[in-house]
Amino acid sequence: MSSPLRILAVDVGTGTQDILLFESGKTIENCFKMVMPSPTVIVAERIKRATERGRPLLLTGVTMGGGPCHWAARDHALAGFAVAVTAEAGRTFDDDLAMVEQMGFEIIEDAEAARRVENPALLHIELQDFDAQAIVTALRAFDVDPGVDALAIAAFDHGAAPPGYSDRRFRFDFIAKTVQREPVPSAFAYLAQEIPASLTRLQAIAESTARYLQLSGSDSQAPLLLMDTGSAAALGALEDPLVRGQGDSLLCNIGNFHTLAFHLVRGRIEGIFEHHTGEITRAQLEDMLVKLADGTLTNEEVFTTSGHGALVLRQSRLNAKTFPFLAVTGPRRALLRGSALHPYEATPQGGDMMLAGCYGLLRALADHEPEMAPMIEPSLLA
């Protein structure tokens, strides 16, 4: 009897990081899972405690997701306390290090950081979106073998925009080019060697995974897949049999920080938009979904309301009978609960909406590593 296939899937969000240890041959319900605070939230809380105590900060590591940790570090500097950061870690706060210096941060060389680590008066925090030590320790604490045959990780990556290029425009321009080239959600997934150079956050995560493979005793050459988190959640929602059976559907992932919606016709993307969840009301979201469905939503309409953008590949003639099936997922999905658009709250195989991104990662890995598909798909489709 062959050994089961074991995959660690991690969906790194702004509020939580959702972790699934998949093992072929098990029902998906019996695979071990954790929903824990996101890396940026963990770092933010550590910084806030340093601010309360007036301790200077030393930030090293790699580029990671911003949001809460960005705001906490900014507030620490504004309170008059020192923030020293290495260049790679500094790009967490802005791709342009001159802008990081304008925030009041000191950019230092790695050698200088290594010297300052010895100072007990400061708080040293290593920035990273994938904390291999924490995950391995957590699994072993429950006598779970952390060894895996593959890793699949999702995160939101604005991309490294050139100076003067809006992060929002850069992000959506990349999305639009991807959809025009390959209009399917799994196009936003990449094997490690194929990650676009501009996706520096995903590149940094890929570098961090080597430590997990080492600590867990896994093969150092184990396949690694990286994916955009909103697309992973949408792909995971398709593991709900009712959603998968729709020929014409809207998939809307309402995350803690970003909302991403696809218009899919027979599995192919007809339109897409992305916005900041905190910047939109239910009425605005409903209006954008209707316009996405009929093909009249414009890029500028989304961008000028502080969103990222929209792309429509084909217009449709809609009426009450032909409006697409609307499936909603994400931790903020209650924004559409009770809507006149009659949203269906997608529940992927296994019954856990918070693991939708992890299920999407498994599906994407099966697409990108076809030899693994026969061991992944039976659990997803059970």
Placement of each model-derived feature along the sequence:
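Nucleotide/phosphate-binding catalytic cleft detector across ATP-hydrolyzing
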Residues: 1-8, 12-14, 22-249, 275-282, ...
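A broad structural signal for short, well-ordered beta-strand segments within beta-sheet-rich domains
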Residues: 80, 258, 268-270, 323
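Short beta-strand scaffold segments in enzyme catalytic cores
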Residues: 17-21, 259-263
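Short acidic-glycine loop/turn motifs at beta-strand connectors
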Residues: 23-25, 264-268
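Extended hydrophobic-aromatic, low-complexity segments
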Residues: 260-263, 270-274, 281-282
